[in-house]
């Protein structure tokens, strides 16, 4: 792919009072961005009940200056509020990326069948969706909405046990 969107949950459960997964998500993002070259484009959407965009609602070039501005953007984020996974994923699909990464603890509310179908239709088979879930201990669910979302959109699911970090 040449264009990437990273959709990162910043709801209360991702913060220091919960999993402290927001900082782990930032590390995952840093690693991913380090792989990009200047011809790649990216966007980051941090969400709770509503999305916040970096740099705005368009793509940014993967140049060092934008990576530095992204660090500043993350520095200003706090984990609070509820979670609207569908709104955030649909916002990420609006810029028609080749690849979308969803990074979340997968907390309720999960995406239901209607919402999963809506995401798949919006993606139109043009965007690969990878899901990275953060949790404590072994993965509890064998068929979470995140596993379905990845499988139905050509992507992969990855689980990060925060106790092993």
Question: Where are these predicted regions, by residue range?
Answer:
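…and closely analogous acidic/polar surface helices at protein-protein or active-site interfaces
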Residues: 2, 12-44, 58-66, 76-78
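Loop/turn elements at helix/coil->beta-strand transitions in domains of secreted/extracellular proteins
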Residues: 2-3, 38-42, 95-100, 124-130, ...
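Extracytoplasmic/secreted envelope proteins and their assembly/folding machinery
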Residues: 22, 26-33, 67, 71-74, ...
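Short, solvent-exposed turn/loop segments enriched in Gly/Ser/Thr/Pro and often Arg
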Residues: 48-49
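VWA/integrin I-like adhesion module and closely mimicked acidic/polar interface patches used
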Residues: 75-77, 106-161
């Amino acid at each position: 792919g040449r264009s990437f969107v990273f959709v990162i949950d910043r709801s209360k459960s991702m913060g220091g009072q919960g999993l402290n997964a927001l900082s782990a998500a930032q590390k995952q993002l840093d690693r991913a961005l380090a792989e990009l070259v200047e011809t790649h484009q990216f966007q980051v959407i941090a969400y709770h009940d509503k999305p916040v965009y970096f740099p705005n609602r368009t793509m940014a070039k993967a140049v060092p200056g934008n990576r530095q501005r992204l660090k500043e953007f993350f520095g200003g984020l706090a984990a609070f509020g509820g979670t609207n996974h569908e709104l955030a994923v649909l916002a990420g699909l609006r810029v028609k990326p080749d690849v979308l990464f969803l990074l979340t603890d997968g907390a309720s509310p999960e995406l239901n069948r209607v919402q999963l179908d809506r995401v798949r239709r919006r993606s139109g088979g043009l965007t690969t969706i990878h899901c990275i879930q953060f949790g404590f201990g072994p993965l509890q669910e064998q068929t979470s909405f995140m596993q379905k979302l990845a499988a139905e959109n050509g992507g992969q699911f990855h689980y990060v046990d925060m106790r092993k970090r």
